[in-house]
Amino acid sequence: MEGEGVQPPDENLENGSRPRFKWKKVLRLVVSGIKAAGLLLCVVYVCLQFSSSPAKDSPIQRLRAPVTGCEGGRLFIGTSKNEYETMEVQNNSVIINCDGLYLIHLKGSFFQEVKINLHFRKDRSPIFVPMLNNGQRVVFTVVTSLAFKDEVYLTVNASDTLCEHLQINDGELIIVQLTPNGYCAPERPYSSTVNQVPL
Amino acid sequence: MEGEGVQPPDENLENGSRPRFKWKKVLRLVVSGIKAAGLLLCVVYVCLQFSSSPAKDSPIQRLRAPVTGCEGGRLFIGTSKNEYETMEVQNNSVIINCDGLYLIHLKGSFFQEVKINLHFRKDRSPIFVPMLNNGQRVVFTVVTSLAFKDEVYLTVNASDTLCEHLQINDGELIIVQLTPNGYCAPERPYSSTVNQVPL
Amino acid sequence: MEGEGVQPPDENLENGSRPRFKWKKVLRLVVSGIKAAGLLLCVVYVCLQFSSSPAKDSPIQRLRAPVTGCEGGRLFIGTSKNEYETMEVQNNSVIINCDGLYLIHLKGSFFQEVKINLHFRKDRSPIFVPMLNNGQRVVFTVVTSLAFKDEVYLTVNASDTLCEHLQINDGELIIVQLTPNGYCAPERPYSSTVNQVPL
C-alpha cells in the first residue's frame, strides 16, 4: 500500500532537492512581495493624484472691449465675442469676479475736451484719468488692486457737450489680471444685458 | 488497490477541511481580483497621462531690447542674447508669433524734439506716442492686442534732423505677453538679419 | 501497486487533455507577462513623476504698499499684511529676489510740487518720474528688468518743503513680476525692519 512503498509526490522532491525547493519558495515569496509593493505604490500614487488633482488654474481674467460713445454719463463699453472675453459687462460696468492686481488700459480720441474718471469701488475715490492733446486724447495705463464685487466703469463729462453727443475714435478698454489664482467667485450664468458690438 | 485503501491527495483534504479549503480558494480569487483591478487602474491612468500629457505651456513671449538710434525712418531695435529673448527682431520690426494681449513699453531721451508712432498691424492706424520734456523724452506704456503676423515697429521723425543723425540715450523697448497660451504659430528657424547689439 | 494500476494525478490529465493543459500553461505565462509589464510601466511612471516632479513654480513676485510720506529723502513705503506681499521692504527699499521683467506703478497726490526719481540698481541712472498737475500728482507706470540684489526705492524732493513735512494723499506703490519662473534667490528669513502700516 502506498503508506509503505509509494511516497506522496512532495516527499520524492525533498530528499534530492529540498534546499532548491526552499530557495524557490523564498524567491517566489520575494517576487510576489515586490509585485504587491509596486502595485500598492502605483495605486496609492494614482489615488493621491485623483484626490489632490491640482485645482484647475482659473483663467487669467481679461477684457478687451471697444469704447464707442457715452450713455448715462458713462463711457459706453461694448463687448465683442472673442477669446479675450472672460469678464462680463453690465450697464457699462465691468464686473470683477476674481481678486488680484489688474492692469487697466484706456485709449481713445475725442472731438472735444473731456474729463474722465475711473471708478472701481464704492468706498474708494475714483482715479482722475490724465488726458493728452488739450483733453481730447487718452492713452492711460494704471495698475490697481481689484476684488470680487468691484465694478469698473468710466464717467465722462464735457463742459459744452451732452454725453450722448460725444464722439470717440479708436476707443478701447483693456483690463488684464496680473496675478491670477487669487479668490474667484463662483461663475454666475452669463446675463443678457451686455452691449453686443462687433469689434 | 487505491480505490479501496489509498485516496488521492485532494480527497484526504476535503473530508477534514473542505470549508477551509473553499474559503482559501475564494480569498485567493478575491485577492487576485483586487490586484488585477489595481493594476488595470494604474495602467489606464498612466496611459491617460501619456495620451493627454498637458500641452507644454508656450513660454511667455517677451523682448527687452536696446533702442540705440534711427535707421530708414525706424527706431533701431538692437537685440541682446539674454533670457528675455523669446521674440525675433527683423528689419527693426519685432515679429509677433503668438496671439494675446501685450504690454509695450518704450523709454529713451533724445537731443531734439521728435515724434514717434507705434505701428503693429497693416490695416490699423498707428498709436501716436505721447512725449515728455518738450518732445525730447519718452516713457510710454501701452497695452494692445497683437496676433500672429503682426509686426511692431516705431517710426520716428524730427523736424530738423535726419533719422540717421538722431541720438538716443538710455533707449529701451520692452514687449511682454500678458495672456500666454493663446495661439502660437509654429516656430521658424531663427533668421540672421537681427541686429546683434551688446546690451 | 501504484506503478501498475493507479497513475499519479498529472498523468491522468495528459493522455486525454495534454494540448489543453499546454495551452493553459502558455496562457498563464502570457497573462503574468502582461501583468508584470503593466506593473513595471506603472512603477517606472510613478518613479519618473517623483524624480522629475515639476519644480514648483515660484509665486509671481508682487507688492502693493501704501506710500504715506517721506523719510530720509525717500518715499515712505509701508507694508500691509495681505496676500499681495511676496516682496520685502527694508529701509523704504523693495528687495528684489527674482530676476524678470517687472511692472512698477506709482500713484499719489501731493500738496506741493515735487520731483520723484525711481532707483533700482546702483550702476544704472534712476528713472525720472513724469508728474501731472504742475508736479503735484503722479500716476506713473513703467516696465523694467530687475534682478536679484536690485532694490527699488523712490527719492523725492520739493523745492520749499522738508522731506518729513511732505504730505501725500492716496499714495500707493505696486510692483508686479510679469515673467515669473526666472532665477530666484533662496528665501531669507523675513527681517523685522519693514514698516508695518495698516492698509
From Swiss-Prot, chains A, B, C:
The protein, known as: Tumor necrosis factor ligand superfamily member 4
Cytoplasmic membrane side: 1-25
Primary role: Cytokine that binds to TNFRSF4. Co-stimulates T-cell proliferation and cytokine production.
PANTHER family to which the protein is assigned, alphabetical: OX40 LIGAND, TUMOR NECROSIS FACTOR LIGAND SUPERFAMILY MEMBER 4
Gene3D superfamilies in alphabetical order: 2.60.120.40
One cellular-component annotation, GO: extracellular space
SUPFAM superfamilies: TNF-like
Residues bearing glycans: 91, 157
Subunit structure: Homotrimer.
Topological domains annotated Extracellular: 49-199
Disulfide bridge positions per record: 70-163, 98-184
Presence of keyword Chloroplast: no
GO MF, one annotated term: cytokine activity
TM regions (residue ranges): 26-48
GO biological process: acute inflammatory response; CD4-positive, alpha-beta T cell costimulation; cellular response to lipopolysaccharide; cellular response to nitrogen dioxide; cellular response to prostaglandin E stimulus; cholesterol metabolic process; defense response to nematode; immune response
Family as reported in the entry's similarity comment: Belongs to the tumor necrosis factor family.
UniProt lineage: Eukaryota, Metazoa, Chordata, Craniata, Vertebrata
Location in the cell: Membrane
Sorted UniProt keywords: Cytokine, Disulfide bond, Glycoprotein, Membrane, Signal-anchor, Transmembrane, Transmembrane helix
Domain THD: start-end pairs: 59-176
Protein topology in the membrane: Single-pass type II membrane protein
Domain of life: Eukaryota
